[in-house]
């Protein structure tokens, strides 16, 4: 039976498209072994990012998953999951176009460049597809 891990951002981060994945996750349980984890932190400090990476690696090391699906904004996890079949859902890149300077460079590295390491990328809209181009 296929094993799938869904990774969700921390629940305190406000509205999350992750709620859309819950019914999908439940339906998939009919055909696959499905687990999910929530990130322990919602901040983007180095320490918080490191905590999220460790939590994700711990889950992946505990069981061999066929697919790891990052459902939210934690694209920065992808390079730390090399060797895994990572699917990521991109919601939008709106924030990227609103920031400047060093923040924009860091956002590009953590959120956009990281996508190059994903096995597959899904987008919630054609608008998001165009943003990625």
Predicted regions and their residues:
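A short, active-site helix/loop in glycosyltransferases that binds the activated sugar's phosphate group
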Residues: 118-133
